[in-house]
Regions:
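Conserved helicase motor core of SF1/SF2 NTP-dependent helicases
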Residues: 18-23, 38, 42, 46, ...
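Walker A (P-loop) phosphate-binding loop of P-loop NTPases
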Residues: 29
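C-terminal accessory regions
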Residues: 175, 267-271, 275, 279-403
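Conserved lysine of the Walker
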Residues: 32
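Conserved SAM-binding loop
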Residues: 5, 51, 98, 218, ...
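Helical mechanochemical/support elements of P-loop NTPase systems and associated helical scaffolds
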Residues: 8, 12, 35, 39, ...
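Conserved RecA-like helicase motor-core motifs
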Residues: 47-52, 68-76, 151-153, 239-252, ...
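Conserved helicase motor core of P-loop NTPases
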Residues: 1, 11-15, 19-20, 129-275, ...
């Protein structure tokens, strides 16, 4: 099948086919996946290609959309407790390495990737406007800004014809607003007062109204607090799990007395290569034995049920009705309820709100107070003071040393 490309996509393909290091950035709907597929189609059969992503879930999605094998960066570079298998002294044997969701790259993982692919052409694909990684630095964003690596920016919105208010509001968030709300067109706002308990009540109401949507998820900035992820999961589990109730076997989780039981939606929180289930995969508990901590989880996207044989393995499972924004990078959901309240004021930023709303494919419900939204739209916190751009551009001031 011949893929139709716009001008920016054609330039990106040319860059990926020729540059030693290529950076491809664009928002949701700009055609990054189509551009990658077109590039892979253009490569000859003798070209050794490797695909990778920072997380297991992102790697699985990359494999699904390309029809090729993809792995985590840790697997690609052969990470062991003793270090990396592929390094600058013994790099990976590949002609081209493509890395998706590159905005998740911290400096440590990015440095390992650059060293371990020293023989290969490297293509980094992502969205420079998303949240910076949990780890130190914002490698992808700094490379985009530095001008020291060739960058292709995909600007055409290929989802605009769908009339998506998510796509319409995303660039508004990045420039500080204002955002548009249309309760009939997929972008709803529920304004509450300063009290965090009002947030919980509003989220509860929105979740009840959309309880028949299995793709519904609530996103909050942090785990802690009255309207954090842990507290919201305690509130939402009885609403969204029709099988919960008195007498049901459960496994306790964490200081907030979270529990998982049959019917509970859960998320895998670390890669388990033995069970072949990756960090970020979301499933439903279909069986549980509280006496030994074993469980069975059905993963619809994987098309299989995974048996967790012991409490040690099920310790990686957490309730997934509410998740942090960071935890959902690289994922999409039909309906997203976003908590944007001044209770989390120190964490609110444009990049966090942008990343949160762009997890939604169809509908966003924004819950919070006016102060919280104003704080998020005002705070351009993604611009971390990393100094990497200045280092790459050679503009760091010389240190003054007094003798």
């Amino acid at each position: 099948m011949t893929l139709t490309l716009d001008d920016s996509q054609r330039l990106a393909v040319q860059l990926m086919l020729t540059a030693r290091l290529a950076i491809i950035t664009g928002p949701p709907g700009s055609g990054k996946t189509t551009t990658l597929r077109a590039t892979l189609d253009a490569l000859g059969p003798d070209v050794v290609v490797r695909l990778a992503a920072p997380t297991g879930k992102a790697a699985r999605r990359m494999a699904q959309v390309t029809g090729r094998e993809a792995s985590t960066i840790h697997r690609l570079l052969g990470w062991t407790p003793n270090g990396w298998t592929y390094t600058a002294n013994d790099p990976l044997d590949a002609d081209v390495v493509f890395v998706d969701e590159s905005s998740m790259l911290c400096y440590e993982l990015g440095a390992a990737l650059l060293a371990g692919t020293g023989r290969s052409r490297l293509v980094l694909i992502g969205d420079a406007d998303q949240l910076p990684p949990v780890g130190v630095g914002r490698l992808f964003g700094d490379l985009v800004e530095s001008g020291n690596a060739p960058v292709a920016r995909l600007a055409t919105n290929h989802r605009a014809a769908e009339g998506s208010w998510v796509i319409r509001n995303a660039p508004r968030v990045l420039t500080g607003g204002p955002i548009e709300v249309d309760n009939c067109a997929g972008f709803t706002r529920v304004e509450v007062g300063d009290d965090a308990r009002d947030v919980v009540a509003a989220v509860h109401g929105a979740a009840v109204a959309a309880a028949d949507d299995p793709s519904l998820v609530v996103l909050a900035p942090s785990y802690s607090g009255l309207c954090g992820v842990d507290a919201l999961n305690v509130t939402l589990e009885p609403v969204l799990n029709g099988e919960s109730g008195a007498g049901c076997a459960t496994l306790a989780r964490g200081p907030e007395r979270l529990a998982i039981g049959v019917g509970c939606r859960v998320i895998q929180t670390r890669n388990d290569y033995r069970l072949d289930v990756m960090n970020g995969e979301i499933g439903t508990v279909v069986a549980l034995d509280a006496s030994n901590g074993s469980a069975a989880v059905e993963y619809a996207e994987l098309g299989r049920t995974v048996d967790y044989p012991s409490r040690e393995s099920t310790n990686a499972l957490q309730p997934a009705y509410a998740l942090t924004v960071h935890k959902t990078q690289g994922s999409e959901f039909r309906h997203v309820i976003v908590v944007c309240h001044s209770t989390h004021s120190f964490m609110l930023s444009r990049s966090l709100l942008y990343t949160a709303i762009t997890r939604a494919k169809q509908h966003v419900t924004l819950v919070g107070d006016a102060k919280g939204l104003a704080r998020a739209l005002r705070n351009d916190a993604a611009r971390r003071n990393t100094a990497l751009v200045e280092h790459l551009n050679g503009t760091l001031p010389e240190a003054k040393v007094e003798l």
